[in-house]
């Protein structure tokens, strides 16, 4: 989706295919491909569709490189809430005070609100945020989506219950697949 969107702006897209030989991990060379101002590097953490968490050192190296050369690192954390150590792995705090790091997330995955289209961006880059506001719709969040988001955040036990259920399901699925 992001590569397609970039093509509308005639952007040059450099992809980093993941391979089984490298355990489907984002390569350490990722940061070295970030060359200068105007570059936008995108990482999905955890990776979709593998579900593998990106090595924090790879994300840190990419963020540092973006800060050095004036580029932008966008980290999609829409699936990160499923990880038990999501708070420790998130780069949202760094993004909040950086002009060169942004975090995308949404209620779509963890809260199962795909049809409500409720998401957010965290960045300390006021120019980026203003540009997104100007490009957006007059009413970007419906009242139904807003109410659902507030209700989801008020259920403070939901995330831990969901993680517990998924841990059990993951173990069951792994067992069943290994018995094939």
What is each residue range found by the language model?
Residues 9-10, 97, 180:
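Short, structured coil segments at secondary-structure junctions
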Residues 18-20, 45, 106, 134:
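Active-site donor-binding loop signature of nucleotide-sugar glycosyltransferases
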Residues 24-37, 49-73, 77-110:
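Active-site pre-lysine segment of PLP-dependent enzymes
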Residues 7, 67, 178:
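Anion (oxyanion) recognition and catalysis
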Residues 1-43:
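PLP-dependent aminotransferase-like
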Residues 40-44, 74, 120-122:
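Structural motif
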Residues 100-179:
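PLP-dependent aminotransferase class I/II
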